[in-house]
């Protein structure tokens, strides 16, 4: 993996995307210093469509809430994440359409999705619009439309990565994506195609390098006694864990727990002496999932040994689906991805089929949390890509991983909470505690302790209001902090 190329692209892409997204804002009368009338029907001589007017109003509302720079940064990284995910999926043949979004089959910057536009089968695709844009030779506009439709179609199988593109995110999608020197063209040219194959870790490296300049800025400001704000904690604290450290930690925690109760499967999990020597010499097979960093336990005192023997009796009763592993600060999912590999070896040694193992790992074993929404997106994506790597039909199974961004309660709508609780004293008490404990949760992250509640009652109430007709219903259903 050419990390210099990855860094060069990611650092440049952040600056470029923020500039391009901001330029789209100017087009709609929105700059850092001035915002034209939010209810305007036209801006700069351009008449707005009903959708554009709605999207522009949503953008202005978000800027008023978070600030101009924060919103432009968020939109830029949202598109960066999507471009990276689409590139990974097209190179590995994971797109359900089997049509490349950025290149042709020879990896030339000639998007196959344009040449195959009239043959595409994507949810939400308006074929009349496709023909209209093709006939008018509006190739750039056609490409942007197809890109948005493709992202929205992927929402069905990857909702944690490809949220429905609506409002201002779509409005600020940069122009001239097909030109020489665009973010997409540079991604194709600078990062070798082979670097995208199978190793989902590339997404983590892209993410770390994308944030590197911001991280430098945060620490430079800190030296001038500028406090690190809650919004900048992710940039200041995230570090992509090197592969050997990830392997060492996972093999000697999750791996050790399993082996202490099931020592008879060592031969299936450990490398041979020849394989270990080759690995140490740098001759490494990318598909090698043997445990090269596992350390045998040191000899213990007889009393300690006896206590360990009792503990191992309990471990011996464990089945793979009973294992629960969490990365409470998951970042972009590097540790979760290797946990997946280790769990696959455990399941295989226990006699599971690949399909059964993959489904059980996602449903029963892996959990991840992060304070950073975009990192949680990438960790979610990493787990889903691991599942797809092992089971080519995984996307059709409707299974979703337990990987979440920590949600804080600072802006919870009081009226929505009142509607949700519906006068129920127990629900009201539970929600009061949750809201109090998750205030500023993104500042504290996984060190927070959430008081156990009657979660079943809360989930039952969510199910109950799903079909309600009430102005507060949608807001109440978005109280995703209940998932914590």
Task: Locate the predicted segments by residue.
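Intrinsically disordered, tyrosine-centered linear signaling motifs in cytosolic regions
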Residues: 207, 482-483
């Amino acid at each position: 993996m050419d990390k210099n190329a990855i860094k060069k692209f990611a650092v440049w892409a952040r600056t470029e995307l923020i500039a391009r997204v901001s330029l789209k804002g100017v087009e709609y009368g929105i700059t850092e210093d001035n915002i034209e009338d939010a209810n305007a029907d036209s801006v700069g001589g351009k008449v707005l469509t009903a959708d554009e007017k709605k999207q522009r109003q949503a953008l202005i509302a978000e800027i008023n809430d978070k600030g101009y720079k924060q919103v432009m940064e968020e939109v830029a990284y949202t598109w960066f994440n999507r471009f990276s995910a689409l590139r990974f999926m097209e190179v590995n043949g994971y797109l359900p359409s089997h049509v490349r979004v950025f290149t042709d089959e020879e990896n030339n910057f000639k998007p196959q999705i344009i040449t195959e536009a009239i043959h595409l089968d994507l949810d939400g695709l308006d074929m009349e619009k496709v023909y209209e844009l093709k006939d008018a030779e509006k190739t750039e506009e056609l490409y942007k439309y197809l890109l948005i439709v493709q992202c929205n179609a992927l929402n069905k199988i990857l909702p944690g990565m490809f949220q429905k593109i609506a409002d201002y995110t779509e409005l600020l999608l940069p122009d001239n994506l097909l030109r020489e020197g665009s973010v997409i063209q540079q991604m194709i040219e600078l990062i070798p195609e082979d670097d995208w194959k199978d190793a989902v870790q590339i997404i983590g490296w892209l993410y770390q390098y994308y944030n590197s300049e911001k991280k430098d800025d945060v620490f430079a400001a800190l030296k001038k006694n500028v406090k690190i704000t809650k919004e900048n904690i992710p940039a200041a604290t995230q570090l992509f864990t090197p592969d050997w450290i990830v392997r060492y930690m996972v093999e000697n925690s999750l791996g050790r727990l399993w082996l202490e109760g099931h020592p008879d499967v060592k031969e299936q999990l450990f490398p041979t002496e020849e394989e270990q020597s080759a690995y140490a010499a740098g001759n490494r097979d990318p598909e090698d999932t043997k445990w090269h960093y596992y350390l045998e336990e040191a000899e213990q005192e007889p009393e300690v040994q006896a206590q360990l023997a009792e503990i191992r009796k309990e471990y011996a009763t464990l089945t793979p689906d009973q294992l629960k592993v969490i990365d409470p600060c998951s970042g972009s999912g590097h540790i979760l991805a290797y946990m997946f590999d280790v769990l696959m070896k455990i399941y295989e040694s226990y006699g599971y089929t690949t399909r059964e193992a993959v489904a059980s790992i996602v449903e029963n074993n892996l959990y991840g949390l992060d304070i950073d929404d975009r990192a949680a997106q990438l960790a979610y994506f990493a787990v889903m890509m691991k599942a797809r790597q092992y089971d080519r039909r995984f996307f059709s199974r409707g299974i979703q991983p337990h990987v979440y961004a920590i949600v804080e309660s600072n802006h919870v709508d009081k009226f929505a909470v009142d509607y949700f609780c519906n006068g129920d004293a127990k629900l009201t008490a539970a929600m009061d505690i949750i809201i109090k404990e998750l205030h500023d949760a993104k500042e504290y992250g996984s060190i927070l302790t959430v008081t156990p509640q009657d979660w079943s009652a809360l989930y039952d109430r969510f199910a109950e209001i799903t079909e309600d007709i009430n102005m507060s219903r949608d807001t109440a259903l978005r109280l995703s902090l209940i998932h914590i």
